[in-house]
Amino acid sequence: AHFDPRRNTMTIKAINVRNQFKGTIKEIVEGDVLSEIDVQTASGIVTSVITTRSVKELELSIGSEVIAFVKSTEVSIAKL
C-alpha cells in the first residue's frame, strides 16, 4: 500500500483487498484503546475492531459512509 507520510494515511486505491463492502456506520462502542464499529452493508452488518485513536483521526461517527476491507485475518475501515 502507498503510505503518504505527510498525511499519515494510506489511500483507498493503494489497498489491495478482494472483499470490500461499502456501508454506513450504525454503531460505535468506544473503549479506552480499542473501539468496535458496526457497518451496515448491502450484505449485512460487518463489525470491525480498530483503535480508538483511528476512530478519532478518521472522524468516524454514526452515519459516516465507509468501506469495510475484509481480509482473512482482519476487517479494516476507511472513511469515504
Regions found by a protein language model. Name each.
Residues A1-L80:
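Non-catalytic connector elements of ABC transporters
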